[in-house]
Amino acid sequence: MDAQFEKAIEIAFDPRSSHALKSQALEFLNQVRTDVQAWRICAALFTRSPRASDIVRHVSLEMVNNAVHSQGLDAPDLAFVKNSLLDYITRTYGPNAQDQADPANVQNKLTQTLTYLFVALYGEGWETFFDDFLALTSSQNGASRDNLSGVMLYLRILSSVHDEIADLMISRQGNESKRNNDLKDLIRERHMQKIAMSWQDILAQWTNKHDGVVELTLKVIGKWVSWIDISLVVSQDMQNLILPLVGRVNNTSNNIDTVRDTAIDTLTEIVAKKMGPSHKMELISFLNLGGIITELLASQGLHEFKGTSRYDNDLAEVVAKLLNTIMTDVVRVLEDNKVDAETRAKAERHLQDFLPALLRLFSDEFDEVCSTVIPSLTDLLTFLRRVGTLPDSYSQMLRPILSAIVAKMRYDETSSWGTEDGESDEAEFQELRKRLQILQKSVAAVDQTLYIEFLSNLVGNMFATLEQQGPQMDWRDLDLALHEIYLFGELALPNAGLAHKSEPNVVATERLAVMMSKMVESGIANFPHPAILLQYMEICVRYHAFFESHHQYIAPVLENFVHLIHHEHPRVRTRSWYLFLRFVKQLRAQVGNVAKTVIQSISDLLPIKAEVPSTEAEDDMSSDESDHSADAIFNGQLYLFEAIGCISSTSTTPETDQALYARSVMEPLFSDMSVHLPRAKSGDAQAILQIHHIIMALGTLANGFADPNQSQNPNNQRTPPQAVSAEFSRASEAILVALNELNTNGEIRAACRSAFSRLLGVLGATILPQLPQWIEGLLSQSSSKDEMAFFLRLLEQIVYNFKGEIYNILDLLLTPLLQRVFAGLSEPINGTDDEIQLQELRREYVSFVQVILINELGGVLVSTSNQGVFESLVNSIMTIAKTIVHGNIVASRISFNVLARMAQQWGGPDVATIGENPTANGVPAPAFPGFDQFMLTQFHAACWEVMQDINFRPYADAQTRQILNEITGLEQIIYLKTGEKFISHCQTVTFPAVGMGAEDFLRALTSSTDRKAVMAYLQQLLKSRR
């Protein structure tokens, strides 16, 4: 069996084995794994002398490891494993080792197995666990820890034991946590003194002899210190061993000293140990951490080599981690109102002592170092904000802190803006800027006056320098000033982050106006560096309100935008198109009659050149700002078309000129469309894409002309000038021609849907006669359910906006529209996406019918033209109402509301009353014969079909409770319209079918107009019958 098992492992893991042979071997191994006694074979194989191959021993040990950890071996079996492994370890790692130490992967698995044995047996069965492995470290009965292989195994086991029972990063179950705490208590009681002494012995033995041993020892100390007595690691003897390692001079050529860095990390873990405020402040003093950090910052690697390639950024990062831990604890003590005066005084001194070092590391040229101390600086600023009125000792800190934050916002000298190689570095820097912005806001929250004065001076000095140096000025300094202007709005704008409620800081608002004036007057828009131009445009857009009160600056800024729209740098050029639109859109009322000039200036950018993307382009994941593909350029062109629409339709532009400008832009598009349409009809991909782009451009231009306030108040929208509407009617007709020819193409339909929704804003009711053509084109046989749902949403908007003018058009188009929708509702479902689209179509369909009824256009549903689809309409709505499944709850609720509105509108006058003495003597008089009976046999029956559905649980689910609310309303309406017929139907049909009497229900329904009372009865009824 042993030989078979060994051979199977070798075959299974031999890359030269055939697939068939390997499969047989793996199948055999899997069978062996199911044998509860297989671990015995594996233990023997692993400890055998002479040794088996490394792979055989690793697989064997893994199975032993699994047995110890997961199979619940009893005490004798565990003792057998322990004795076998201990005997093997003594032969392999002891002072008189006969065999070579195991490779790293086997040692790792061995250490893990021994750790599991420790967990199982240290309480009882292997009380000498640590003694046994400590004995391996010495060749002279403990006189010195000179056996290297034994020392390394001992340290690995200590590290593994900590990870298993004390690592706070691992989530533990309740029983496991108790077990671990018990084991830690036993270690403290039995062996902690001896283990701590062994660390001293090992450091004394191997310092300057074997860095690997020293580093591993320090890591073990750093792990264990969190849960042992602190005195064991802060004794003078221990510190005499650790501190020289912290400060040792690095003589390596590669500037890396992992022992020194690990020693500093160990200090960090010692400082991070939880303890009372007074003890923590004393610990910081005892360890002389202030002096240590000062010496480290003055070391050659951090001082002399600063700004050179030999700068030791690894050292800077570990020092920053230590300092961040210290400062976090110091601030925590200062925040504690319960600490005594002496402890607080110590914390104050530590704060003053460590702040310069904190700012030095915060200002480090390596952003990783800066980021390491941001948490403690954040804590400090949060504390200062809570203090209220700051004493001088605190207020004096703010200026150097703010200065350091602002300086860190600056691009460093090595940064290369805008290059492909530097994209990731720039993205990381922008993320750092966001974190720095939070710190800067914290300073402003503590002292707004300082913040305003500091940044005003910074910006003022930068513009003074620009005036003196012109284009020779360092772009990084100018970028910093512009970045700070951009952030300054946190104080100066209403409802911004630092503005109290809706009131901005008055002084900040005044200073911002000064900054903006200086910026516009400085000629910065002609600066040669693209980063500055982008910042300039972003600021103009952000502070558009400034131009509303400083009209004199609008014209020069517009001129600058038009210039930058043609900039040679692609990132500036394409970004400027979007920002230009934002600028003119927000200042539409102030830009004046400048459309002719602007159109002439940017007309060279308007011709559309569609390019079918290649497969490589489709796979390119470029960011928006760096994407210079044809598709990205076209999207940018759309911003220009919309901007032209905005500028051309200002209140100061005569209507005839508006129409002229629209025509001048659209005529070339019409011509281009007529040229490409024949090719597009024959399937030419480039021509189809060109038509798509032209349609999108026409729609986007219309969007620019549309009243910007119509979406907020559709009932009070500005009527488009007749001359402008006439021009866009031509656009609508041109698009319809293309749609009619190409409506089998989904992309073309999508572009037409977009254009249609935007043309509504400039055509208003004049588009209504074209609606049948739009429906014919947009709802083709190849239209998806998504497309139908989207178009129904548009029609809801049209019905709402033009309810007084749409009846005749709606009467004409309703039947073909509903027939398309019915076809979509009945299509087979293939997969989750289809199901989601069907749910959306159902919702939009019943919402559309609801909008018709709400706007008193219900007559169109039963008109002569649409009688043929009325029955299908009602049946489809009832089907949706009765479909109580996830994803259809909203549609079901709306459907019952639609049925209630139909009953109210066509059920005739009320023939019954609801109250303490209800009456039901009248004769039903529905709007058309038989509708009263239809309500009973169909609407009423639908209500009770849903209420008997086991998925309908309104007493436990808020969404179905809303459906019950609509059902209750519908039932009361049917009762009011049919009276005694309703009562009789309930008594003879409905309730006998469900096996109960109708009296309680009728009493609840007819005695109160309060729906809640009826719903309460129905909920209780349904709950009792489930």
UniProtKB/Swiss-Prot annotation:
<keyword id="KW-0963">Cytoplasm</keyword>
<dbReference type="GO" id="GO:0016363">
    <property type="term" value="C:nuclear matrix"/>
</dbReference>
<keyword id="KW-0694">RNA-binding</keyword>
<keyword id="KW-0819">tRNA processing</keyword>
<dbReference type="GO" id="GO:0071528">
    <property type="term" value="P:tRNA re-export from nucleus"/>
</dbReference>
<dbReference type="Pfam" id="PF08389">
    <property type="entry name" value="Xpo1"/>
</dbReference>
<dbReference type="GO" id="GO:0005737">
    <property type="term" value="C:cytoplasm"/>
</dbReference>
<dbReference type="GO" id="GO:0008033">
    <property type="term" value="P:tRNA processing"/>
</dbReference>
<dbReference type="InterPro" id="IPR040017">
    <property type="entry name" value="XPOT"/>
</dbReference>
<dbReference type="GO" id="GO:0005643">
    <property type="term" value="C:nuclear pore"/>
</dbReference>
<dbReference type="GO" id="GO:0000049">
    <property type="term" value="F:tRNA binding"/>
</dbReference>
<dbReference type="InterPro" id="IPR013598">
    <property type="entry name" value="Exportin-1/Importin-b-like"/>
</dbReference>
<comment type="similarity">
    <text>Belongs to the exportin family.</text>
</comment>
<dbReference type="Pfam" id="PF19282">
    <property type="entry name" value="Exportin-T"/>
</dbReference>
<dbReference type="GO" id="GO:0031267">
    <property type="term" value="F:small GTPase binding"/>
</dbReference>
<comment type="function">
    <text>tRNA nucleus export receptor which facilitates tRNA translocation across the nuclear pore complex. Involved in pre-tRNA splicing, probably by affecting the interaction of pre-tRNA with splicing endonuclease.</text>
</comment>
<dbReference type="InterPro" id="IPR011989">
    <property type="entry name" value="ARM-like"/>
</dbReference>
<keyword id="KW-0539">Nucleus</keyword>
<protein>
    <recommendedName>
        <fullName>Exportin-T</fullName>
    </recommendedName>
</protein>
<keyword id="KW-0813">Transport</keyword>
<dbReference type="InterPro" id="IPR016024">
    <property type="entry name" value="ARM-type_fold"/>
</dbReference>
<keyword id="KW-0820">tRNA-binding</keyword>
<dbReference type="InterPro" id="IPR045546">
    <property type="entry name" value="Exportin-T_C"/>
</dbReference>
